[in-house]
């Protein structure tokens, strides 16, 4: 696995034992730490699947444009994956979206 490829980091997140929940239930309870994904969200997995499926089924190809209406982490995941595949991404977001998220989506 090429660890320098951002796409290989998606979904490669650790399990973390939830100590209190484990003690309360008498079972080992683990949570998947999705915030370790490049976009810090489980939505990175969805974005990777959507784009790879579209490429596989010849719905989009290198140089193509994706248009997404989003107010959240799906757009961030799509931005990361689209850039890695050489695709253009146009995101439509509400005017009320935070400045930080707008800046992050422009990367």
Language-model features: locations:
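PLP-dependent amino-acid enzyme catalytic core
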Residues: 1-107
């Amino acid at each position: 696995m090429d660890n320098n490829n951002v796409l290989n980091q998606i979904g490669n997140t650790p399990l973390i034992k939830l100590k209190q929940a484990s003690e309360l239930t008498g079972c080992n309870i683990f949570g998947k730490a999705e915030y370790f994904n490049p976009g810090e969200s489980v939505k990175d997995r969805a974005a990777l699947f959507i784009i790879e499926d579209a490429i596989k089924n010849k719905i989009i190809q290198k140089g193509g444009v994706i248009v997404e209406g989003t107010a959240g982490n799906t757009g961030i995941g799509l931005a990361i994956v689209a850039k890695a595949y050489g695709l253009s991404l146009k995101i439509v977001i509400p005017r009320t979206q935070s400045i930080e998220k707008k800046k992050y989506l422009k990367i």
